[in-house]
Amino acid sequence: MGKELKRDLPDGGQIIMIQGAEEDNNVKLVYQGFMEELEGSNLEVVYEAHCKGWRAELAVDYLDEALEKYPDVSGIMCGNDDIAAQVVRVLAEHRLAGKVQVVGQDGDLAACQRIVEGTQTMTAFKSVELLAKVAARYAVSMAKGEKLSRINSSINDGSGDIPFCMLQPISVTSRNMDEIIIDGGYHSVEDVYLNVPRED
């Protein structure tokens, strides 16, 4: 998400972060990666909020408050695409939809529609098929007592470090929507381009 904002905002700008539940370890990992990606850029995080219990509707008040303080915001990092939906709605009310870069994650159909409509910049997509294939491969290897390959990270659950294979999400934008989402069979062309004509 940070990489996409850096690419789309080369001159820098103010960034708002509206994340998921603060106690969710995934939120902490995404935050860490996002901040590392922004290092050395002219992008400045000026406002941060967390949607308790991943309640996306909380983003409405957070963004209204943030826009009062920072009306010239350039980009908004959203914890997921549900939060991004609320953010885009508020931006539309302020006549800013499509003018402020919005990034989210999950690859929801509605997010894909917003991307081709121009109100959301990108979604970080995690292929369920790939996750299932990798999980099945590891399950078979473990059942056979084989050494696990490609373990590239670990996480501490309080009792010790648990090794795991971290898969990288795919940045889906209007540039690769057809290739990743439609050709991949995740959402149909008719559904993604429901509200706008598809450019050939």
Language model segments and positions:
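Short beta-strand elements at the ligand-binding edges of bilobed clamshell
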Residues: M1-E4, M17-A21, E48, E117-E129
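Hydrophobic alpha-helical segments within soluble ligand-binding/sensing domains
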Residues: M1-I15, L29, E57-V60, G107-A111, ...
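Sec-exported extracytoplasmic/periplasmic mature domains
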Residues: K3-D11, M35, E39-G40, D64-D72, ...
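Hinge/cleft segment of the Venus flytrap/periplasmic-binding protein
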Residues: Q14, I18-N26, E36-L38, V134, ...
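Second-shell loop/turn segments in exported
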Residues: G20-E22, V46-K52, D72-S74, M122, ...
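Extracellular/periplasmic ligand-binding modules, especially the Venus flytrap/periplasmic-binding
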Residues: N80-V88, V116, M122, K126-K144, ...
